[in-house]
Regions:
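Conserved small/polar residues in nucleotide/adenosyl-binding loops
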Residues: 177-179
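Short acidic, glycine/serine/threonine-rich loops at helix termini
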Residues: 98-100, 123-129, 170-172
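Histidine-rich, glycine-flanked metal-binding segment
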Residues: 1-54
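Charged helix-capping and loop-helix junction motifs
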Residues: 72-73, 172-175
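Metal-cofactor-binding active-site regions of metalloenzymes
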Residues: 81-87, 91-92, 106-135, 159-166
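Active-site gating/metal-coordination segments in enzymes
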Residues: 129-173
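Metal-associated gating/positioning segment near the N- to mid-region
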Residues: 37-40, 47-106
Length: 179
């Protein structure tokens, strides 16, 4: 007896090079089999005829923190698109990351984060990030390193938005930063 059987869908599993019409059996929240489960019993049956059944997708560049102008809701955008993991690409800065964790921890999708080298993160209504290395240097580099030490499983990299509106004439100075 299974908890859920997803029947009659086109199952695409790139990792196992599987692409065929099949059923998916789920028990205790885990996929326990892919194949013919037409005669198997389950508490719930979902008919996926005409639909694709696939492992959760990864959005590798999202802005999920709703306190930034670009922020989006994971429930409204990720879940309907089969995204189960999203990488927030620098919405929070190193000085605001700990505040953003409150939101991130409530998301229904798994979130990993690139922390912005700008202390405040991405701009809100006309404020551009401060990425001047003269401002970031010394003590701030240590604070960024300590943030990564504290949240090793959550933070996966650093975001530096490189466009002329943000970096202006600091390109050479920025290329010399090592964090």
């Amino acid at each position: 007896m299974y908890d859920i059987i997803i029947r009659n869908g086109r199952v695409i599993d790139p990792q196992n090079k599987f692409d065929a019409k099949a059923d998916v059996a789920i028990y205790n929240g885990k996929i326990v089999g892919v194949g013919d489960y037409q005669n198997a019993e389950s508490d719930r049956v979902l008919d996926a005829a005409g639909h694709i059944v696939t492992p959760g997708l990864i959005d590798a560049h999202a802005h999920l923190w709703p306190l930034t102008k670009m922020g989006i809701s994971t429930e409204c955008t990720c879940i309907p698109s089969a995204v189960t993991t999203a990488i927030d690409a620098g919405s929070a800065g190193w000085a605001t990351y700990e505040t953003s964790r409150g939101f991130i921890n409530t998301c229904k999708v798994r979130v990993k984060t690139l922390v912005n080298v700008s202390p405040m993160g991405l701009p809100c209504n006309g404020y551009l990030e401060n990425v001047d290395p003269d401002y970031l240097g010394g003590v701030y580099e240590r604070e960024i390193e300590q943030l990564f030490d504290r949240y090793r499983g959550e933070l996966i990299g650093i975001k530096l938005r490189v466009n002329t509106g943000v970096i202006k004439d600091m390109g050479e100075k920025l290329s010399l930063i090592h964090i």
